[in-house]
Amino acid sequence: MRYLLSIILIASGFNSWSQTTIIRQDQQIKTMVEEVSSQNIESIVRKLVSFQTRHSMSDTLSATTGIGAARNWIKSELERYSAASGGRLKVEFDTFTQAADGRRIATPMVMKNVLGLLPGTDPADDRVFIVSGHYDSRASDVNDSKIFAPGANDDASGTAAAMELARVMSKFKFNCTLIFVAMVAEEQGLYGATNLAKRAKAEGWNVAGMITNDIVGNTYGIETGLKDNNSVRIFSEGVSVVESPEEVVRRASTGSENDGNARQFARYFKEVGERYVEQLDVKLIYRRDRYLRGGDHTPFSQLGFAGIRVTEMNENFDRQHQTVRKENGTDYGDLPDFVDYEYTRKVTRMNLASLANLALAPREPQKVGIVTSGLTNKTELRWELPAGEIPIGYYVVMRETSSPVWQKKFFVADTKAIFNYSKDNYYFGVQSVDSDGHESLVVIPRSVR
């Protein structure tokens, strides 16, 4: 209880200059965060580059070259982490046959995502969180499966992040299930992620959030000349493509287009990531992805799951999707010497802190409602206990309608609360919290009478 009371955010007003935030960190999460190693991340990136190409249509039989050698090595590394975890991390290939598409898949191809599943310890908590990077690579010609395609930043960096998360987190126990994934065939059309998303849907996984770390190792922006190792972007969609007609009406009437599940997930990553990782500013980008680009979170978003993309702040396109060469004095190609491994470590730590805090937290409160039975300048909220672990209390979060992030948090021990703020002027949400300060995702209230 002492911890819980001390973590409450204290704000004298909504202007950022007048806010004071008390930071309290869970020691177990802090220990995990500090264990993330830039040396391990660099070692993984360089090993993946050593396979010469990880093109999804490349050699699957060689022990030293091509996509087959790469996936076998990733699996063996995850199995090594599993042994260190006492066998709790379950490692498998997620195998499927991708049909020819007349574009980037010339002939049917057996493809494999590599999964490390860390089962939750609470039988009543069926939440699943998926974190990934894609291990395939490409050069300038997307269909050239033989040319050297190092793919150090795109996306050995994200694969290394997911693997380092598996190494560290598999030594600990969490309420719910975590799945660490090295995705295949992102460059060919998000085929690995599409297969896994469909599997999750078909098998009834309760995917509460999916994160892809894609291009998380560069700190220099081409053309602008910006150098920034303190910022990272999180992309999230606002309006789900699977909205029901009722949800469309409710969104239009309440102005909740910025409060979809993916946006809440992204806000959570910003709040908790910045709580644990120093010198890191998480920028919330309110769109699904960049122009002309896509990522492995998209197939999950298209099936209604909360998918977000983590990617570097400034991009160098001379070192993405480029054949390695020197031309007019410019170095092209995605080589490991161009990766900022300390930066990738920061991004990995942000992932870890947010995932661990979520996976240790109680589930979200149920049937969260905002009372709209009459005209009033007060706001009345009520909700029901979450399934599973009983929280010690709840945070009611609040923000101005123009703010991208929650600005105030009020601790409430009950399942109802009344505030002297008008619901017409602010957005509200409710999240569960345990005695160690682990918060659930925020639930946006629905109108009740």
Residue ranges, per PLM feature:
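Beta-strand-rich modules
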Residues: I418-S440
